[in-house]
Amino acid sequence: MPTINQLVRKGRKSHKGKSKSPALGFVYNSFKKEEIKNPSPQKRGVATRVGTMTPKKPNSALRKYARVRLSNLIEVTAYIPGIGHNLQEHSVVLIRGGRVKDLPGVRYHIIRGTLDTAGVDGRMQSRSKYGAKKPKK
């Protein structure tokens, strides 16, 4: 515990929180070849690899993921939500933050229904989260 004198001299340092999705916090300037801190809610990227991985211990499945090279040249692993997808290598995707609890190292989600990613077809509930159009009556 600090003394009163130490607190007067130095004071308390406020804790800076760490970002849970750090790749969304930078923009790459290709002219100056430098990264600038400029946080954004989503980022565009190109899928470099699409595959499946198995979740952590109590769960069992084949979760779909894509390795994405973002527009700021950072490469991240993103989860593909929903049943079925049309992604392949070189597909242009939009990612958002949000981790998948049982996949280590997956801190981002791919947004369905934008750019090259098709929405989930046959989806009736929570359609906006999966890019599904309203069904015809």
Curated annotation (Swiss-Prot):
Give the molecular function GO annotations.
rRNA binding; structural constituent of ribosome; tRNA binding
Is Glycoprotein among the key words of this record?
no
Comp. bias intervals (Basic residues):
9-19
Keywords from UniProt, A to Z, are: Methylation, Ribonucleoprotein, Ribosomal protein, RNA-binding, rRNA-binding, tRNA-binding
| Highest rank taxon of the organism | Bacteria
Which SUPFAM superfamilies does the protein's record reference? Nucleic acid-binding proteins
- Which GO biological process entries does UniProt record here? translation
Q: Does the keyword rRNA-binding apply?
A: yes
**What InterPro entries has UniProt attached to this entry?**
NA-bd_OB-fold, Ribosomal_uS12, Ribosomal_uS12_bac
Q: Name one GO cellular component term.
A: small ribosomal subunit
Q: Which residues carry this modification: 3-methylthioaspartic acid?
A: D102
Gene3D superfamilies recorded for this chain? Nucleic acid-binding proteins (2.40.50.140)
Q: Where is this region: Disordered?
A: 1-22, 37-57
- How is the quaternary structure described? Part of the 30S ribosomal subunit. Contacts proteins S8 and S17. May interact with IF1 in the 30S initiation complex.
- State the similarity comment: Belongs to the universal ribosomal protein uS12 family.
Q: What does this protein do?
A: With S4 and S5 plays an important role in translational accuracy. Interacts with and stabilizes bases of the 16S rRNA that are involved in tRNA selection in the A site and with the mRNA backbone. Located at the interface of the 30S and 50S subunits, it traverses the body of the 30S subunit contacting proteins on the other side and probably holding the rRNA structure together. The combined cluster of proteins S8, S12 and S17 appears to hold together the shoulder and platform of the 30S subunit.
Q: What is this protein called?
A: Small ribosomal subunit protein uS12
In its UniProt entry, the species of origin is given as: Limosilactobacillus fermentum (strain NBRC 3956 / LMG 18251)
Which taxonomic lineage does the organism of this UniProt entry have? Bacteria, Bacillati, Bacillota, Bacilli, Lactobacillales
Coding gene? rpsL
